[in-house]
Amino acid sequence: MEQQSDGLKVMVIDDSKTIRRTAETLLKKVGCDVITAIDGFDALAKIADTHPNIIFVDIMMPRLDGYQTCALIKNNSAFKSTPVIMLSSKDGLFDKAKGRIVGSDQYLTKPFSKEELLGAIKAHVPSFTPVDAVS
């Protein structure tokens, strides 16, 4: 498997295989190194091993939900400055507020577009320059 050492490390945590694959495909096309996790427990071990530059996390997941996962990331001194973007099919004010309380940096509603994903990355990792994908 080819490793892009200069690619931005992006983690996508979602229990939906479709969402993980979609995000992974979109992000790899612009030069990102994508790490996926199926839930918060899976993600925490991978975060410690890979040190992603930005993390996208679904809210509604079994075992350890997105709010709990975000809080654990933000309470860890090694990762508290890592941007965490919440992903949810809900677009409610309460959900967004709860995300802010646990330390999330942004909130994206699913389904998301390539532009929304890249916009979130650019907003929180200003040095990121997407590679132009060949159509």
Curated annotation (Swiss-Prot):
Pfam families to which the protein is assigned, alphabetical: Response_reg
Family matches, as PROSITE patterns: RESPONSE_REGULATORY
Residue(s) carrying 4-aspartylphosphate: 58
Keywords: Phosphoprotein, Two-component regulatory system
UniProt note: phenotype after gene disruption: Deletion results in decreased cAMP, surface piliation, and twitching motility. Supplementation of pilG mutant with exogenous cAMP restores surface piliation but not twitching motility, suggesting that PilG regulates pilus biogenesis and function by at least two pathways.
GO biological process: phosphorelay signal transduction system
Reported modifications of this chain: Phosphorylated.
InterPro entries assigned: Bact_response_regulator (IPR050595), CheY-like_superfamily (IPR011006), Sig_transdc_resp-reg_receiver (IPR001789)
Domain Response regulatory span(s) in chain numbering: 9-125
Domain of life: Bacteria
Disulfide feature: none
Known role: Plays an essential role in both cAMP-dependent and independent regulation of twitching motility. Regulates the cAMP-independent coordination of type IV pilus (T4P) biogenesis and retraction that plays a role in surface and host cell adhesion, colonization, biofilm maturation, virulence, and twitching. In addition, phosphorylated PilG is necessary for cAMP production via regulation of the adenylate cyclase CyaB. Acts therefore as a response regulator of the chemosensory system/Chp system.
Protein name as annotated: Protein PilG
Species of origin: Pseudomonas aeruginosa (strain ATCC 15692 / DSM 22644 / CIP 104116 / JCM 14847 / LMG 12228 / 1C / PRS 101 / PAO1)
